UniProtKB/Swiss-Prot annotation:
Localisation: Cellular thylakoid membrane
GO biological process: photosynthesis
InterPro entries: Globin-like_sf, Phycobilisome_asu/bsu, Phycobilisome_asu/bsu_sf, Phycocyanin_b
Its biological purpose: Light-harvesting photosynthetic bile pigment-protein from the phycobiliprotein complex (phycobilisome, PBS). Phycocyanin is the major phycobiliprotein in the PBS rod.
Location, primary (coarse class): membrane
Membrane topology: Peripheral membrane protein
Annotated positions binding (2R,3E)-phycoerythrobilin: 153
Protein name per its UniProtKB record: R-phycocyanin beta subunit
Record-annotated disulphide pairs: none
Family: Belongs to the phycobiliprotein family.
Residues annotated as binding (2R,3E)-phycocyanobilin: 82
Thylakoid as UniProt keyword: yes
Cellular component per GO, a single term: phycobilisome
Length: 172
């Protein structure tokens, strides 16, 4: 996993060049937005159980066959596994959001996840729908202006959304 700074240094080193002005500008913008980033990650982390529970409730309301006898989330053990997986994905989205880089999400969470779900018979489309529901809930919390650093969060919100999109695409 690389944070944004380490990634820029590694790329410049691989090119055998100094860090470019545009790379420095991009990192400077990230630093100037760091309080917003920390606020966003803190808000998602502090509301993780609510985000997961809300997404699960909505998912099971939309796809009741998942919790019906024979469904993939039927029995408390399977339901717990589903909620655990949603929480793990959300946790890695927060790591990527904090670092400003998706590599931790890709390398430690999503790599091989689709294959695992296929082997277990877990419907990837349902997992992707759950991830998208978590995205909606998390972004609503991030975009709530009450009690956070002043400023436009559109860019950060968009970035966080892409991490959820990567997760949904990886399992669909």
């Amino acid at each position: 996993m690389f944070d944004a700074f380490t990634k820029v240094v590694a790329q410049a080193d691989a090119r055998g060049q100094f860090i470019s002005a545009s790379e420095i500008d991009a990192l400077a913008a990230m630093v100037s937005d760091s309080n917003k980033r920390l606020d966003a990650v803190n808000r998602i982390s502090s509301n993780a159980s609510t985000i997961v529970a809300s997404a699960a409730r909505q998912l099971f309301a939309q796809q009741p066959s998942l919790i019906a006898p024979g469904g993939n989330a039927y029995t408390s053990r399977r339901m717990a596994a589903c909620l655990r997986d949603m929480e793990i994905i959300l946790r890695y989205v927060t790591y990527a959001s904090f670092a400003g880089d998706a590599s931790v999400l890709e390398d430690r969470c999503l790599n091989g996840l689709r294959e695992t779900y296929l082997a277990l018979g877990t419907p990837g489309a349902s997992v992707a729908a759950g991830v998208n529901l978590m995205k909606e809930s998390a972004l609503a919390i991030v975009n709530d202006r009450a009690g956070i650093s002043a400023g436009d969060c559109a860019s950060l919100s968009s970035e966080i959304g892409t991490y959820f999109d990567r997760a949904a695409a990886a399992v669909a």
